[in-house]
């Protein structure tokens, strides 16, 4: 086990690695879990659980663990280019600037 005195030290130890696929937080303090998970450099984080993954959720890491996410609907974005197309379906007035 790696020991630490303060939460900041635990976060520094956790983030001071080359990889960032997943992280685990064990605590009874929900506020601490939310704060720590926000700062933890990992693509997937479990709180009081060990690698129980719902398959449609995104899978992937950061740093040397890779970029992007795979799994579920998140996979599609890797293989596609998004484009916005807006259609006016009614007869509407286009405002004239300066009038």
Predicted feature descriptions by range:
Residues 1-99:
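Conserved C-terminal structural/oligomerization subdomain of aldehyde/semialdehyde dehydrogenase
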């Amino acid at each position: 086990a790696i020991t630490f005195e303060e939460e900041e030290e635990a976060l520094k130890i956790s983030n001071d690695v080359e990889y960032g696929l997943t992280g685990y937080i064990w605590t009874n303090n929900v506020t601490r879990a939310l704060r720590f998970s926000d700062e933890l450099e990992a693509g997937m984080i479990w709180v009081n659980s060990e690698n129980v993954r719902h398959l449609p959720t995104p899978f992937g890491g950061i740093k040397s663990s890779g970029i992007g996410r795979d799994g579920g609907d998140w996979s599609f974005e890797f293989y596609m280019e998004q484009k916005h197309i807006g259609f006016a379906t009614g007869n509407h007035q286009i405002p004239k600037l300066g009038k």
